[in-house]
Amino acid sequence: MRKQLSVGITFGLIFLSIAVTAVVTVLAMQHKTNDVLGDLPEKMARYEMLDEVDSIISEHYYGSNDQKVLRHAVANGYVCGLNDGFSRLLTSEEYAQYLAVNRGQMQGVGLSYHKTDSGSLKVDTVSGGSPAAKAGIKKGDEIVAVDAIVLDLSNCDEIAQKLENPSVLSVSLTFRHKGQETTVDLEKGYEAASVSSESYQNIGYIRISEFYDSTASQVQETVDLFLASGVRALILDVRDNASTNIENAISTLDVFVPLNQEAPAATLLNKAGETVTAFSTSAGEVNLPMAVLVSKGTQSAGELFACDLRDFGKAQLVGQKTAGNALVGQSFRLSDGDSLLLSVGVMMPYKSDSFNQAGLLPDVEAELNEKTEKITKDSQFLAAASLFTE
């Protein structure tokens, strides 16, 4: 037979529960209040100068101002004060472009250039796979007219904006190559090529400039072709690769290394040192001698890729000490539609200690004697190739 509590005891327990809850709530609120009050002087000092500047501008500034622009500038200045290369504030349009570029989706025609003394545009680089490349424009060519308007010193800067303006979807270019002028119509937008390759004395060379969504599949296709041709070694070039896309870097790494068994292939740690994400590799691998070319400009996902290849025992590093940037970024959407990019953690490689600020020391140090597009004149490439010819 179940015993029932009396009404008095029941109400007493209810009141006791309410009292305990109230005490706990008060203590929690007091703790939170103490934290807030403790931060109050710092917060007041933080905004005191801004309030003072705002007051002076409101009273004395002769011109007009756009409050939204001012708010964005203030927030952007705050972020810039972090002195962090990744962290920044982007408008909604800038953020959309940032995402597209990270995926390898470019908006322009694939040219970089500089203005000549006559007002024409001298082509410095042509992106592989771009509309300009497909139209036959080469490095060193001159753009002499845009949309049938001949370029000169008086109009060059204004007319050239048509090449950069994302709202202009197509453009007609007249370019001069070895004295001959050609006019082409170009549609803007293309998927950037991040992988190029060639052979040297039965050694396969693969240049990886970025880690885009399509990079891993491009690398896999290139490796398959090299394996079918019977190359005896591979040289992977990630010099100046400063990509921040870790997931794509691990997907590309997966082409070369086996299943990670001792630890995650890469681990992302937050501010508290807690694991946020752990990346793995699959069972496939390449069983050839390999070297990785690195430089002072190799950083972030480029460094992780190189470090992991060495940690897996698959490759030696050749070149210069790398940049030492292992910070991980995250985007935060703000209430006005802007986005905040912020460094929120650090990436850890397969076995090595963190390379953040320390960089990666190459197994074989080699300086680049000159900037060249020919690997046969590339001193760092030749230093790597010598590992497989001795």
Question: What is each model feature region?
Answer:
Residues 212-232:
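A short, well-ordered alpha-helical element
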Residues 122, 158-197, 343-344:
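PDZ-domain C-terminal substructure recognizer with occasional recognition of PDZ-binding tails
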Residues 2-88, 116-119:
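Terminal targeting/pro-maturation regions of precursor/exported proteins
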Residues 142-174, 248, 325-326, 331:
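PDZ domains, with a preference for the canonical peptide-binding region formed by the helix
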